[in-house]
UniProtKB/Swiss-Prot annotation:
GO molecular function annotation: carbohydrate binding
Domain C-type lectin intervals: 111-218
Gene3D superfamilies hit by this protein: Mannose-Binding Protein A, subunit A
Signal peptide (residue range): 1-31
UniProt keyword terms in alphabetical order: Disulfide bond, Lectin, Signal
Protein name: Putative C-type lectin protein 51
Protein's organism: Equine herpesvirus 2 (strain 86/87)
This protein's record includes keyword DNA repair: no
SMART domains xref list: CLECT
Intrachain disulfide bonds: C193-C209
Pfam families from the UniProt entry: Lectin_C (PF00059)
Length: 223
C-alpha cells in the first residue's frame, strides 16, 4: 500500500512539475513576443543641411537662430519667437523702380496689376524670403489676400505655400510692407508664420517656420 501511495505521489508531482515548466515557457514566450511587438517612438533629429537651403551669404541665418546643435551636429527646434524677434524683415520688402516690375514672362499667374510665382522647390519660411528675392528683382514673399480665390485655384491639392505674413514682435500679424493683417485663422497662440493651401480660405498659422513648403512670390506688374 505504501509503495502504491509513493508511486501515485510521484506521478502527481511529475505532472505538476511538467505543467509548471510548460506554463513558465509560455510566459517567457509571451513576454518575448510582447517586447517585439511594442513600437518605441523615436525623435527625428534634422541636420543643418536638411533645413537651410542657402549656405552662402544667408542674411537671415535661420538655422543658427532657430536651432541649437549638439556634438553630432543635430538640431532641436526652439520657439519661433527667437526667429521673429531677431530679424529685420523689412530687408525683404519690395523696393524697386517701374522698370524692374515683374512681367508676365516671369509669373505663374497675373491678377489686377500683380504677378504671382509658385516655387517648385520647398523651403523654410526664411528660405522662401531668400528665394523670392533672388528669383526676380521685384519679387518678394507676398501677402495674397487680395487675390486669394485666384491664387488658391492654381495650388495643387497636396501642396502648401509660405506667404509673406508673420507675427511681429508686438504679437500682431503683419506683412512685408509692415501693414497689419487681419483674417489669419489664428488657431495657436505661439504661431509665427502663415501659409496657404487649396483648402485654406484664409492664411493659416504655423508654429514651426522651418517646415519645408513651397513659396508664393509676388510683385507689381509692369505696364
Amino acid at each position: 500500500m505504501a509503495k502504491r501511495i509513493n508511486f501515485t505521489s510521484c506521478l502527481i508531482f511529475t505532472s505538476c512539475f511538467t505543467a509548471f515548466i510548460v506554463s513558465l515557457c509560455l510566459l517567457v514566450s509571451s513576454c518575448v513576443n510582447l517586447v517585439n511587438d511594442v513600437i518605441i517612438p523615436s525623435v527625428h533629429m534634422s541636420r543643418r543641411a536638411d533645413i537651410t537651403p542657402f549656405i552662402d551669404n544667408y542674411t537671415i541665418n535661420f538655422t543658427d537662430l532657430h536651432f541649437f546643435t549638439d556634438g553630432a551636429n543635430a538640431s532641436v527646434p526652439q520657439p519661433e519667437a527667437i526667429f521673429i524677434n531677431s530679424n529685420n524683415f523689412s530687408l525683404y520688402a519690395h523696393n524697386c523702380s517701374a522698370r524692374d516690375n515683374c512681367s508676365v514672362h516671369s509669373a505663374s499667374i497675373t491678377q489686377e496689376g500683380r504677378c504671382y510665382h509658385y516655387s517648385r522647390a520647398k523651403y523654410s519660411f526664411a528660405g522662401c524670403l531668400e528665394f523670392c528675392r533672388s528669383y526676380s528683382p521685384c519679387y518678394y514673399l507676398i501677402n495674397p489676400q487680395k487675390h486669394m480665390t485666384a491664387v488658391r485655384q492654381n495650388i495643387n491639392e497636396s501642396d502648401t505655400y509660405w506667404v509673406g505674413i508673420f507675427k511681429s514682435p508686438k504679437n500682431t500679424w503683419v506683412d512685408l510692407d509692415n501693414s497689419s493683417v487681419t483674417g489669419v485663422h489664428d488657431l495657436y497662440e505661439d504661431s509665427y508664420c502663415a501659409y496657404i493651401g487649396l483648402y485654406t480660405e484664409v492664411p493659416w498659422p504655423s508654429f514651426y517656420c522651418d517646415t519645408p513648403r513651397r513659396c508664393l512670390c509676388g510683385g507689381s506688374k509692369g505696364i
